[in-house]
């Protein structure tokens, strides 16, 4: 006998995951994975620091004990507060008491949503968005994603508010919150300050919570200049939210910016809502490993490493992005110009925008041993868009783009014919 939850997952969610990511889930090494957003460029640079730390014999029995403090390791919460105060320009100083640690950004978000939403409550979120958020919203918490269709030309503009307002009024559920990804995944762009302020004002007026997912905050390609002073990352914490007291929350993780997805250490920040902090701390109690918090203290969140990520790390991402951008321009492929992150959103199927054509292209990708993420998995309404990740070493990226070139050529020479038989590829 199994739970209804288990049966539902095996009937719907798990088959979809296996269909799209089966080769990766089963460890097939013959495929080139450009679907996973990892900063592998930084991983290689960080590896000697990890090895040195393990060789230095700086361990104590404390690393084998339970973590101390409400909300996770106090030292790491203090270091994250220092990072945010130095690089997110918060309107009010962030204190470690505002921070709750989790085993990665997703589990921090799980705890935050659990503190805000009852089962069945709605959360506004604009599409496209990273499908992993559905796990935190619907799978782990039984809340409901209220998908907002914002036209691309309005997505990062103040004009987007009217689309959120329309979705809120027509939602079949009680809407408790709104999630934004800033920097955005998969579009690779930052929200301008004026749009963020409009979003905070909207949430304050409607008395709903704003959750800003800022896990790519330091993964920037473009710096503000005199010609483009508004470029760059703006945190929701930097805004005057005095009229939205207790409603603004930020999720952050070390995974993306610092190239350490496997360490599993994230956090949420709530400056003016002690009830949310305490509830979240209860949900994540003893969730984070003392090994992870030790690595964060000794290696990841040192001043030297943060400076390295903010300078050299940005250059690595910019160089890889340029390779990706040149490839797409060379093949006359439409894409969303990115200014942050380690991925690009591209219309690989061109003018062929039917579901059948996207299925055909995905079959061609599988045949050529290349893994990309389809935009429809990100709730993109128009088939044919894909997210391509480029935060890997240059040789892997070159190999992946060679395979993508072959896929594009084969797709251009192939017409979809019904009935569609995936096995023929």
Swiss-Prot record:
Gene3D superfamilies reported in the protein's UniProt record: Aspartate Aminotransferase, domain 1, Type I PLP-dependent aspartate aminotransferase-like (Major domain)
Modified sites of kind N6-(pyridoxal phosphate)lysine: 256
Pfam families, sorted: Aminotran_1_2
GO biological process: amino acid metabolic process; biosynthetic process
Source organism superkingdom: Eukaryota
Cofactor(s) required, per the database record: pyridoxal 5'-phosphate
Protein name, entry field: Probable aminotransferase tcpI
Organism the protein comes from: Claviceps purpurea (strain 20.1)
């Amino acid at each position: 006998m199994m739970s209804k939850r288990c049966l539902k997952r095996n009937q719907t969610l798990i088959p979809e995951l296996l269909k799209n990511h089966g080769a990766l889930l089963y460890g097939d090494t013959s495929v080139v994975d450009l679907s996973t957003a990892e900063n592998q460029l930084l991983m290689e640079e960080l590896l000697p620091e990890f090895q040195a730390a393990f060789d230095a014999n700086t361990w104590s029995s404390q690393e084998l004990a339970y973590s101390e403090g409400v909300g996770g390791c106090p030292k790491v919460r203090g270091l994250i507060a220092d990072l945010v105060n130095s690089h997110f320009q918060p309107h009010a100083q962030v204190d470690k008491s505002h921070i709750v640690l989790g085993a990665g950004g997703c589990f921090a978000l799980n705890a935050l949503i659990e503190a805000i939403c009852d089962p069945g409550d709605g959360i506004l979120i604009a599409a496209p968005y990273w499908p992993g958020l559905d796990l935190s919203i619907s799978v782990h918490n039984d809340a409901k994603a209220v998908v907002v269709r914002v036209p691309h030309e309005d997505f990062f503009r103040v004009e987007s508010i009217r689309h959120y307002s329309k979705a809120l009024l027509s939602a079949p559920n009680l809407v408790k919150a709104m999630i934004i990804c800033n920097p955005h995944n998969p579009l690779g762009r930052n929200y301008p300050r004026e749009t963020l302020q409009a979003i905070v004002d909207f949430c304050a007026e409607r008395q709903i919570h704003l959750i800003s997912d800022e896990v790519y905050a330091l993964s920037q390609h473009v710096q503000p200049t005199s010609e483009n002073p508004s470029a760059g990352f703006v945190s929701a914490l930097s805004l005057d939210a005095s009229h939205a007291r207790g409603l603004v929350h930020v999720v952050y993780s070390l995974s993306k910016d610092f190239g350490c997805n496997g360490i599993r250490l994230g956090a949420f920040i709530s400056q003016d809502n002690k009830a949310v902090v305490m509830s979240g701390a209860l949900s994540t109690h003893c969730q984070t490993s003392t090994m992870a918090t030790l690595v964060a203290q000794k290696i990841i969140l040192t001043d030297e490493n943060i400076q390295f990520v903010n300078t050299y790390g940005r250059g690595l991402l910019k160089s890889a992005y340029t390779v990706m951008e040149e490839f797409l321009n060379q093949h006359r492929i439409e894409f969303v110009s990115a200014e942050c992150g380690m991925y690009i959103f591209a219309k690989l199927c061109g003018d062929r925008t039917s579901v059948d054509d996207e299925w055909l292209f995905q079959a061609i990708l599988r045949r050529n041993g290349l893994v990309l993420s389809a935009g429809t998995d990100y709730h993109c309404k128009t088939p044919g868009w894909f997210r391509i990740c480029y935060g890997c070493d240059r040789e892997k990226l070159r190999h992946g783009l060679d395979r993508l070139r072959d896929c594009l050529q084969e797709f251009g020479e192939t017409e979809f014919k019904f009935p569609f038989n995936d096995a023929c590829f």
